Amino acid sequence: MNQLFGSDKLRLPQRAQAGIAFVRYLIARMNHDRINVNAGYLAYITLLSIVPMLTVLLSILSKFSVFENVGSVLQSFIINNFVPASGDAVHAALQEFIANTGKMTAVGAAFLFVAALMLISNIDKNLNYIWRVKKKRRAVFSFSMYWMVLTLGPILVGASIAATSYITSLRLLDSEAISTVYDQLLRWLPFILSSSAFVGLYLLVPNKKVQFSHAVVGAMIAAVLFELSKKGFAAYITQFPSYQLIYGALAAIPILFVWVYLCWLIVLIGAEVTAALGEREHWRPAEDVIQSLPNNDTELEKDTQRDRFDSES
């Protein structure tokens, strides 16, 4: 560790050295995994699957009378808290798309369900690649897990929203002190929900054991980046409305794509942090970082060995 910078003269505390080695390894790991390319791919799949996902979710909620009106509340909450700027235009477009799906045949409805499964499957594959998972889940187990997400997920979301609405209607909130606490809780609710979702994602999706503390650290970093990017992206859209000037009424489409891309980039950064924290043995000096990456790509290994041979000869 004392030779982290290639010199014994420059000595840093052990924790600082470990931190610098971790950051270098993390950057090399993210470059190696090309998370910017994968984020673009996931953004593309998400835009193809977002309407099917919402359609499946809302159709399941509509089967339960207790969840009446929960769908509209859920859409408004997602748009207002997780889509910065142009939220009204995106909301209106999504509502129009979802309304049109009611005219579809059974074959079209089956296609929507397959598209929703495709998104979940691609998320699973990309995150398992980050953790270098070589052993794939059985097809039956994977399908049952995806099915559970699509069926139980909407029910749990609807139950939480219904419970929140019930608590809001109680007279206990008439108290000024409790009302202040409730307002603060609502202000922090998007951050709490996003960080909790990241923790669950980093713990449950990889087909290997992930330490809870590592998942929490990665989730907190991702949640902070998400909140900062939300404010920064909203400020950029409002202060520099180039998309509105160029695309006019269609500006919501590229804006939504860029935002979804940023979201997936943040998700993958948090996953890389979580995975790298569990690979302490690979935190080495910068010149050894690439060779230390646990890789499941045989072609890349061959290219690396060929480069070493050429340099030695």
From Swiss-Prot:
Identification of the protein by name: UPF0761 membrane protein VV1_0885
Primary subcellular site in the record, as a coarse category: membrane
A GO term from the CC aspect: plasma membrane
Organism: Vibrio vulnificus (strain CMCP6)
Assigned protein family: Belongs to the UPF0761 family.
Keywords: Cell inner membrane, Cell membrane, Membrane, Transmembrane, Transmembrane helix
Region called Disordered, residue ranges: 294-313
Biased composition, class Basic and acidic residues, residue ranges: 299-313
Subcellular location, record wording: Cell inner membrane
